[in-house]
């Protein structure tokens, strides 16, 4: 009898999981840097693997690694994992973990959330917060991690047509992404944005008003909302993120 019950339970478990509505998507992006007269050069590769389950849960695995000359000057290679929920057609993290090697130093950050509030933070190694501009617990409320931010930026509908500002905290830095304008062009839609630094930046190097001169996020159109690229300019330096197709 016990054996029969076990078989029935196993069969039901298998059927339920087989019928789960899952969506998997792998994508790859390249970050380029460009100076005047000099062709753009790829300096960073971002790989993502997104799994959505029953339109209620999501799992985002990602890898970030430096390329070309940057890999020799200041190499970075890291893997991350975000587990979260999908509500109101948007992504909200429940946990964020990022482990990476910068040069010869291994580092990691772990953030856990509950009801959009941070309930746990673990850093390896620990860093001296006294050298950084302060961040209060209240300023961490309703924040998301940078990987979830990137995931939202890939779909114009996830940023509500460029009409909602986003609060970000990566375990050290706290900043806002503020959308200011949406423009229809012959190539699609361009969203203008800026960064407002709240805290967690080096005291001797931070200017509260410092930001890129120009930030644009580009989408094909509002119908399919396909991400076309990210463009930023600060002084003579241009930063471009494009998807590899």
Residue positions per predicted region:
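A contiguous pocket-lining binding segment that forms or flanks enzyme active sites
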Residues: 140, 144-159
């Amino acid at each position: 009898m016990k054996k029969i019950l076990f078989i029935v339970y196993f069969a039901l478990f298998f059927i339920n999981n087989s019928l789960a509505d899952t969506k998997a998507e792998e994508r790859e992006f390249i970050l380029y840097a460009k100076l005047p007269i000099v062709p753009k050069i790829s300096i960073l590769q971002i790989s993502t693997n997104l799994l959505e389950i029953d339109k209620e849960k999501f799992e985002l695995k990602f890898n970030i690694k430096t390329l070309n000359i940057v890999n020799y000057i200041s190499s970075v290679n890291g893997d991350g994992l975000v587990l979260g929920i999908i509500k109101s057609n948007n992504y909200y993290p429940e946990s964020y973990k990022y482990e990476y090697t910068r040069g010869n130093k291994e580092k990691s950050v772990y953030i856990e959330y509950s009801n959009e509030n941070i309930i746990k933070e673990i850093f390896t190694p620990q860093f001296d917060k006294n050298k950084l501009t302060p961040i209060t617990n209240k300023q961490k409320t309703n924040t998301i991690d940078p990987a979830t931010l990137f995931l939202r930026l890939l779909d114009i509908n996830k940023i509500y047509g460029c009409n909602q500002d986003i609060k970000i905290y990566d375990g050290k830095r706290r900043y806002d992404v503020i959308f200011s304008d949406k423009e229809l062009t012959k190539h699609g839609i361009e969203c203008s944005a800026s960064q407002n630094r709240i805290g967690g930046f080096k005291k001797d190097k931070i200017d509260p008003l410092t930001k890129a001169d120009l930030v644009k996020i580009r989408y094909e159109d509002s119908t399919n909302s396909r991400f076309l690229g990210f463009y930023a300019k600060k002084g003579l330096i241009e930063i471009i993120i494009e998807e590899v197709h």
